[in-house]
A protein has these predicted regions:
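Catalytic domains of cell-wall/extracellular-matrix polysaccharide-remodeling enzymes
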Residues: 47, 69-196
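Active-site beta->alpha N-cap acidic-glycine motif
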Residues: 1-100, 186, 190
């Protein structure tokens, strides 16, 4: 997504928390349909580091999510968050050769979980990352796969039911969930058959 760009009839597929055991299958599906996505990656699963390179090589956007995804660590202070962010930024650069400057905060930029660790941390962090040239992105459509939804049919319904023709359609999904990967082909075909890019 770029400010000022017409977003009508566009669906932005975004995936958090990977790469993981199901990411390669997801990449195969995306490649089959020539669809590009944004991956907000983590650093704690070293078994799938090679997929960072594949994501980049296949034309996807790689954003930074968190190295540890440990709320109790990253949301205690600006310094703790920045250390974690720079760690995942360095890892992405190591595997892709590029320094990503786009991020998605774990829980989103207006999450309430972080208050448990420090009040006002999110407003402080959003200001800090922007001052350093980072851009953060949230979402407008929740697939439900981060919570109790483990049924691919429900994920498809959540996503397709949230899409609007004239709005910004940024879908939050997780490539570490097998049921999300099971749902993605139906989400893509819905979008393509209804004239979305």
């Amino acid at each position: 997504y770029k400010p000022g760009v017409n977003t009508a009839k566009t669906i932005y597929l975004t995936f958090d928390d990977g790469p993981g055991a199901h990411t390669a299958r997801l990449l195969d599906i995306l490649k089959n349909y020539n669809v590009k996505a944004t991956f907000f990656v983590t650093g704690y699963n070293n078994n799938y580091n090679d997929l960072l390179k594949r994501e980049k090589e296949e034309g996807h956007t790689i954003g930074l999510h968190s190295y540890s995804h440990n709320y109790g660590l990253i949301y205690t202070s600006i310094d703790a968050y920045m250390e974690d962010l720079l760690s995942i930024q360095n890892k992405v650069k190591e595997y892709t050769g590029e320094e990503s400057k786009i991020i998605r905060f774990p829980g989103g930029s207006s999450n309430t979980i972080s208050r448990k660790y420090r009040t006002h941390i999110m407003s402080d962090l959003t200001s800090k990352v922007e001052s350093l040239g980072f851009r953060y992105f949230d979402w407008t459509i929740v697939s439900g796969d981060a919570g109790d939804t483990k049924d691919s049919n429900k994920i498809v319904s959540n996503v397709t039911g949230g899409i609007t023709e004239d709005g910004l359609n940024v879908v939050l999904m997780h490539d570490i969930k097998p049921y999300t990967v099971d749902a993605i082909e139906r989400i893509i075909t819905f979008g393509l058959s209804n004239g979305y890019t």
